[in-house]
């Protein structure tokens, strides 16, 4: 791909070897085109080693003339590959290195990890019933990579989360969650029929680990870990407690649990502060 100057998709270069990396750096430093520069930044980010990080850091401090025609700095390009760096060039990991998917089971199963459970509480803004949109059992050996020895619950108003900037929770490892204050909407578009259907889904977690990019190129596969299938641009929210970038945890495509729904719910986590943030993207 590099020899033929194929720079899309950037995932082609994920963890590429030093020889490929050096060729990308050479091309990046020589280009005068913002379009080629943008693609090469993404490819180099996917390589993701120490030398690649150093080049991206240097380009943020001393940008090329074509940078003025791009929307974001090189550290944001690094986010496409699931990492970034701070002002001191300290590496920040934004994704997990394992991936599991949800698949259709024979029956509804609320033991362990599952999607969508009604909470029996109403949204203070629109009156829609609140849901635990994801319950994740970190004690399951499949999720040992999360480093969370307990049950994590992500809760939201399914109506408001699709029409607002997002909803955050504070969680405890006994499965409880506190929905933090959020800006909602007055109109409720969810009927009881929709909510019941959502809470009756038969999705269960896969027994086998999936490839890291398993969910990145499918808009009908719900995943935990790995890389997301961003509908718009990749987006890593800041933790409302500590202000640091949150890690991507999971994605749920609405049409897998709700007929004719559009868009995707992305779930991110700050393990240190025990904060979950959920937000919606759609075309």
Language-model-detected regions and their locations in the chain:
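Preference for intrinsically disordered or flexible, low-complexity segments
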Residues: 1-283
